């Protein structure tokens, strides 16, 4: 906040707000209702309660498939294919989508990494075996994130673009139907006997291995090139190569 001198005329006050600060304080009360949401009978604060309450309850519940599926089914009507209109209608909605997308990505990555670690280090050094893939596909979290990927890829393209892990997982055995009469997304879940496809996990693991190998190879190549092209770099690491000296007779 900027302040300026009152001047010589007023001796009672020594500081007064500048014109830019006054404009900010005048515009803020008019823009506050738009940021809080549409008016309702309960007031503007009801927007915060109904928007953030389901999210905190989702995080508090145990990380199981039925709890998260039930929570996200209640939030599906808030999702629309038209992302700009959804962002204008709920200004804080996009901020929550970005935060929860990183949260989900970290959780699923941690669970898959733990499973791979308990399966043995050989799974990372060789081609992934059928037993490891079967163990991964048997987790409830995998089925749940496949369900989320199917929902978000069809109705929440903004959120789906930020879920790197979910895009690599299979979007299988879950069909979506948008009911125009009820204005909501209806889900058709697969039968309990179906299992996720293992080829998608193999492709994801191969892509992870390829990215790690390419990053390491590029780093080593860059170091070798700099080592050969910049002689001063050798002395930084303490290597002094002998040079030929010619003595004149």
UniProtKB/Swiss-Prot annotation:
Q: How does it sit in the membrane?
A: Single-pass type I membrane protein
One Pfam family named in its UniProt record: PRRSV_Env
Q: Which chain regions cross the lipid bilayer?
A: 208-228
Localization: Virion membrane; Host endoplasmic reticulum membrane; Host Golgi apparatus membrane; Secreted
Which residues does the record list as glycosylated? 173, 179
Taxonomy, superkingdom: Viruses
> Intravirion compartment: which residues?
229-249
Gene Ontology terms: biological process: symbiont entry into host cell; virion attachment to host cell
- Which residues constitute the signal peptide according to the record? 1-35
UniProt keyword list: Glycoprotein, Host endoplasmic reticulum, Host Golgi apparatus, Host membrane, Host-virus interaction, Membrane, Secreted, Signal, Transmembrane, Transmembrane helix, Viral attachment to host cell, Viral envelope protein, Virion, Virus entry into host cell
Assembly information from the UniProt record: Heterotrimer of GP2a, GP3, and GP4. The GP2a-GP3-GP4 complex associates with the E protein. Interacts with host CD163; this interaction plays a role in virus entry into host cell.
Q: What name goes with this protein? A: Glycoprotein 2a
Q: Which organism is it from?
A: Porcine reproductive and respiratory syndrome virus (strain Lelystad)
């Amino acid at each position: 906040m900027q302040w300026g001198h009152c001047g010589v005329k007023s001796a009672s006050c020594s500081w007064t707000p500048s014109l830019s600060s006054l404009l900010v304080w005048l515009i803020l009360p008019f823009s506050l209702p738009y940021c809080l949401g549409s008016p309702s009978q309960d007031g503007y604060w009801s927007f915060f309660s109904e928007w953030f309450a389901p999210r905190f309850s989702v995080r508090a519940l145990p990380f199981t498939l039925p709890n998260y599926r039930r929570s996200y089914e209640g939030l599906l009507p808030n999702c629309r294919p038209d992302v700009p209109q959804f962002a204008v209608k709920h200004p804080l909605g996009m901020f929550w989508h970005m935060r929860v997308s990183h949260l989900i990505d970290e959780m699923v990555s941690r669970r898959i990494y733990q499973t791979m670690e308990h399966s043995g280090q050989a799974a990372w050094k060789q081609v992934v075996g059928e037993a490891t893939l079967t163990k991964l596909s048997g987790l409830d979290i995998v089925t749940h994130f496949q369900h989320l990927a199917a929902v978000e890829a069809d109705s929440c393209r903004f959120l789906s673009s930020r879920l790197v892990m979910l895009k690599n997982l299979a979007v299988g055995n879950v069909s979506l139907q948008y009911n125009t009469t009820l204005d909501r997304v209806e889900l058709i879940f697969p039968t309990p006997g179906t299992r996720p496809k293992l080829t998608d996990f193999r492709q994801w693991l191969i892509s992870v291995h390829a990215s790690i190998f390419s990053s390491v190879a590029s780093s080593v190549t860059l170091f070798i090139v700099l080592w050969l092209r910049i002689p001063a770099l050798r002395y930084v690491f303490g290597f002094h190569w002998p040079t030929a000296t010619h003595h004149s007779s």
